[in-house]
Amino acid sequence: MVYRPTAHEFDDLPKIEFIDSCPYQVFLEQYLKPCVPVLIGPKLTAQWKANTTWITSKGDPNILHSYILPDKPCTSRDNTSGNSLLNDNDIKNFIRSYAERIVNNEDKNVFLDSLLLSPNYEYLEENYGTIPVPLAYCNEKDRYGSQRRETVPLKSALHELRDEQVQLQCRQAPSNQALKSLYAKDMHLFRHLDPADFPYSTPDIFADDWLNAYVIDCESDDFRFAYLGSHLTTTGLHTDVYASHSFSVNLCGVKCWLFIDPKDLQTIASLYDDQQLPSWITKDDLFRGPLVNHRHLIKILFQYPGQTVFVPSGWYHQVLNIGTTLSINHNWCNASCILQMYTALKEQYEVSAESLKDLLEDGIVTKDRFSQVVTEVVEANYGWCWRRFWGMIKHQLKRRDAILHSSEYFSKWPIQPEFLPPLSWEYSILKNILLNDEPGSTFDSGSPPSSIVTIFKSLGDFKE
């Protein structure tokens, strides 16, 4: 079925498909391979421990519940939400329309109860309070024009976020303009956790993850995050790191997403005076401004508690939090987006080399040193480099080889064979980057290292 929220003038924006449950083969063929976003129902993560420990209905009620009660005014005045995408009437219409379309009374009551859920501040502080986290002030800008951030212990962030939630609930602030609009983003709460203490398990449909398998096994790092934002906080229009995929599981609060298909990026950028994508798409953009005749290219999605969003590689998206929201997110990758990641990294090297070419032409550095400088700049600005990219590929090929031969290969990111795509398909993708160029002697160039090519060719005997 298709998820179709209605909120008057937003009705003509295309919607992201909703599916109640998603078997692996369905996900692989209909969404992962073609890189199509999808919203998945609560069954996918119903068994998560975080559903009972990270959130609660006994604490301060979430402000978004006021949008559903006819005898209760909304917290913010109409058109003062400060986010410039949805005013309070828009939000009210979306949420009430969704509730009205739930036929089963029991299901409707479950949904209404979910709007009361809030973060379990005491539990989060007790278990993760000393971990340093990035805290964004969404109403403030740094010198580069981005949201101002600082790193604080999670305990401090929780205290400030809870204060904001209480102020909104008590009607002490008419909008987020009077508050700090705090959003704790990219929180690494799981990096050093013992597996027995994990509050969730990665859904099987997302388990074929080369990125986390590599950085967890080889770098003691991860791309697993938690996000905690107050009412009307935002993440601007962007695409995910390294051209990876992501998924986001919403535990409490509501998220409004806008999506742009990669094939429509140039068209949309051309509609703006500077020929660039905006940092935030506004309601005026959609209905009176540059997008008024092209808003059919913008897809909208409301994500409610318990639901999971799959964001494919290359899809630009922005997010507005409604109520206090708490989510668990991964960046991840596999064969379905490895060509996009390869191309994106190659472009980073080309752009950096072009900007630094005077160093080479003026004889300031040697050719070998120039390559090192380019790599240093790419890694500093982009956070990724050929050495790590090829290391990830090699790690994945070794894991695949071990599965094929039923041999021992220890990994902190194990995967069951039934949640892997056909090797023949994976092989057909990888050969585009592993067999088209002459192998290199090191891991530091865009040419595939010969040691990786050797492993890859050996898998060719099994690909059928």
UniProtKB/Swiss-Prot annotation:
InterPro entries: JmjC_dom, JMJD6_ArgDemeth/LysHydrox. SUPFAM superfamilies: Clavaminate synthase-like. Pfam families: JmjC. It comes from the Eukaryota. Transmembrane segments: none annotated. Residues 182-349 form the JmjC domain. One of its GO terms (cellular component) is cytoplasm. One of its GO terms (biological process) is positive regulation of translational termination. The gene is jmj1. This is JmjC domain-containing protein 1. GO terms for molecular function: 2-oxoglutarate-dependent dioxygenase activity; peptidyl-lysine 4-dioxygenase activity; sequence-specific DNA binding. It comes from Schizosaccharomyces pombe (strain 972 / ATCC 24843) (Fission yeast).
